[in-house]
Amino acid sequence: MTESVFAVVVTHRRPDELAKSLDVLTAQTRLPDHLIVVDNDGCGDSPVRELVAGQPIATTYLGSRRNLGGAGGFALGMLHALAQGADWVWLADDDGHAQDARVLATLLACAEKYSLAEVSPMVCNIDDPTRLAFPLRRGLVWRRRASELRTEAGQELLPGIASLFNGALFRASTLAAIGVPDLRLFIRGDEVEMHRRLIRSGLPFGTCLDAAYLHPCGSDEFKPILCGRMHAQYPDDPGKRFFTYRNRGYVLSQPGLRKLLAQEWLRFGWFFLVTRRDPKGLWEWIRLRRLGRREKFGKPGGSA
């Protein structure tokens, strides 16, 4: 009997981008058996509801009257998929899409061949698919091109590392073992925290090098320091900085990631004091990290 695949897409006020994403999703050679769309702006007559209803496969529209963020949106969609009996859960957001119609079939074949609990495609720049949407560190070297992920001819899998949640494919049993994203994180860092759980579970996972998911470039946030040997993430938007730094304070306090703390202080200390000459920025980074470490998950502008 063929195992069922439920696609989960989270959206927030991007109906045009969502339509493009769903066009590619519903053109897969291996169609998902069911599509769940979580609308984080699901008040009243949302245009997303009509868009979802018009898809050529079975669908469920989950409109949320509260913006749950990416973390809460994916958690809601994943739990709904599990409750409906999904064997696999395939994730996507509204500002990206699979590179071609073979991505889901390729991921399933890769998971079967290598007995993977989770498999992700490469996440490439939607404007230049030869480049990665986010830089990937391998050892002390940062990779920025998709071709750099292959270290030998014919390599199909990059084991033990995966980008979540853009195009990520999970077995239902994997989600039962590691859980779903943490609602408290809202946005930013929820994928790192899930990746941490995947590693600690001991379950096999990785990146399929024969499949790609296209996403707007996020590399500009990663500022090179020490002649490019390291990077520090600095979003231009203050709200994104709040969630990035606060959540990273929490994530790096968790088992499995505490070993990165010394490097974190070196990178951001250098970035704020040497590169930017911004001691106030460093103190704000410290304040936000402290909020996360103490599990104070309020919104920007609050004391917690």
Curated annotation (Swiss-Prot):
Its main location: membrane. GO terms for molecular function: galactosyltransferase activity; glycosyltransferase activity; transferase activity. Was identified as a high-confidence drug target. The keyword Cell wall biogenesis/degradation applies. It is an enzyme of class 2 (transferase). The gene is glfT1. Its EC number is 2.4.1.287. Pathway: Cell wall biogenesis; cell wall polysaccharide biosynthesis. It catalyses: alpha-L-rhamnosyl-(1->3)-N-acetyl-alpha-D-glucosaminyl-diphospho-trans,octa-cis-decaprenol + 2 UDP-alpha-D-galactofuranose = beta-D-galactofuranosyl-(1->5)-beta-D-galactofuranosyl-(1->4)-alpha-L-rhamnosyl-(1->3)-N-acetyl-alpha-D-glucosaminyl-diphospho-trans,octa-cis-decaprenol + 2 UDP + 2 H(+). SUPFAM superfamilies: Nucleotide-diphospho-sugar transferases. Interacts with Rv3789. Is thus probably part of an AG biosynthetic complex. Keywords: Cell membrane, Cell wall, Cell wall biogenesis/degradation, Glycosyltransferase, Membrane, Secreted, Transferase. This is Galactofuranosyltransferase GlfT1. It comes from Mycobacterium tuberculosis (strain ATCC 25618 / H37Rv). Belongs to the glycosyltransferase 2 family. One of its GO terms (biological process) is capsule polysaccharide biosynthetic process. Involved in the biosynthesis of the arabinogalactan (AG) region of the mycolylarabinogalactan-peptidoglycan (mAGP) complex, an essential component of the mycobacterial cell wall. Catalyzes the transfer of the first two galactofuranosyl (Galf) units from UDP-galactofuranose (UDP-Galf) onto the rhamnosyl-GlcNAc-diphospho-decaprenol (Rha-GlcNAc-PP-C50) acceptor, yielding galactofuranosyl-galactofuranosyl-rhamnosyl-GlcNAc-diphospho-decaprenol (Galf-Galf-Rha-GlcNAc-PP-C50). Thus, GlfT1 is the initiator of galactan synthesis, while GlfT2 continues with the subsequent polymerization events. GO terms for cellular component: extracellular region; plasma membrane. It comes from the Bacteria. It is found in: Cell membrane; Secreted, Cell wall.
